[in-house]
Amino acid sequence: MNQTLIQEILEVVEQAAIASAKLTGLGQKDEADAAAVEAMRLRMGKIEMKGKIVIGEGERDEAPMLYIGEEVGSGSGPGVDFAVDPCEGTNLCANNQRGSMAVLAASDTGGLFNAPDFYMNKLAAPPAAKGKVDIRNSATENLKILSDCLGLSIDELTVVVMDRTRHKDLIKEIRGCGAKVQPISDGDVQAAIACGFAGIGTHCLMGIGAAPEGVISAAAMRALGGHFQGQLVYDPAIAQTSEWADYTKEGNIKRLNEMGITDIDKIYEANELASGENVVFAGSGITDGLLFDGVKFERDCVRTSSLVISTLDSTARFTNTVHIKDGAKSISL
């Protein structure tokens, strides 16, 4: 991987964001996702690389494009594995709510954990708390540690939690400690990464979300130097989701074993979920969010706001791009 490839990866998420943003607020989440998928795949196809989707839109028979195992790119050049979510927060995009974005993680071949389409208990925290907070601890213990690491009182801390029934007790415990809870309906990738930057106002992400997005978050936090841990959730009684209404704990364990995951209770660190020598995260806003603005359509241009975090040069680059339309007469600053 090199800087030229990273620039092209940025353009991949920009094009996906623009495609989805054209459908923002129309209540068409599936169409917004499909538009992002098509745009992302089209731009990936122009990159000189031997790319492979390791986390994508589903299995080969479930998704027409960006399915798990699909080869992308020109077929020559460096080997790159991708974990992609072309429209993270499809409901947010459909309803014109904050936090939707096009995201991906990239690494050298074999550098990303091939997470199953399961749930994952996650803990994300700032670099100052790396290796000090622990997902094995109670929320109360972690808040005390986080308070010490950041030099803030517990009542000055804000914890992001997915607004789900399964988090009722977690939210009660956090608030019982005096910390603030910021519930989100979707989009925990951006919430996890935001914990890595001071001044945003969120200090920790706790709770259960999708496992594939956990890998993308882990890649970003590893490159940023933040804390991230994840543990797969296979018990429907814990996940408490209608998607698993017909699933059993035993059946899920069997599925994991068939995928080669035998240590089903393993706690994964960021450098295990994103283990490659070179790791890159790229995200571009579809709607406004914690980290960057959404796509803005103007008469003569389209503006995107994006973030690229890379281990290659230990940088986090916030990028505002003006995509100039044909025949443009005037571009404002």
Swiss-Prot record:
Q: What class of enzyme is it?
A: hydrolase
Task: Show the stretches that span the lipid bilayer.
Answer: none
| Any GO BP | glycerol metabolic process
One family from Pfam that matches here is FBPase_glpX
Gene3D superfamilies (alphabetical) = 3.40.190.90, Fructose-1,6-Bisphosphatase, subunit A, domain 1
**Is Oxidoreductase among the key words of this record?**
no
Name the positions where substrate binds.
88-90, 119, 164-166, 186-188
Is Ribonucleoprotein set as a keyword in this record?
no
Q: Name one GO cellular component term.
A: cytosol
The entry lists its GO molecular-function terms as:
fructose 1,6-bisphosphate 1-phosphatase activity; metal ion binding; sedoheptulose-bisphosphatase activity
Name the InterPro entries on file.
FBPase_class-2/SBPase
Q: Which UniProt keywords apply?
A: Calvin cycle, Carbohydrate metabolism, Hydrolase, Manganese, Metal-binding
Catalysed reaction(s)? Answer: beta-D-fructose 1,6-bisphosphate + H2O = beta-D-fructose 6-phosphate + phosphate; D-sedoheptulose 1,7-bisphosphate + H2O = D-sedoheptulose 7-phosphate + phosphate
Which SUPFAM superfamilies does the protein's record reference? Carbohydrate phosphatase (SSF56655)
| Residues annotated to bind Mn(2+) 1 | 33, 57
Q: Identify the EC number(s).
A: 3.1.3.11, 3.1.3.37
What's the subunit arrangement here? Homotetramer.
Q: What does this protein do?
A: Catalyzes the hydrolysis of fructose 1,6-bisphosphate (Fru 1,6-P2) and sedoheptulose 1,7-bisphosphate (Sed 1,7-P2) to fructose 6-phosphate and sedoheptulose 7-phosphate, respectively.
* Protein name per the record: D-fructose 1,6-bisphosphatase class 2/sedoheptulose 1,7-bisphosphatase
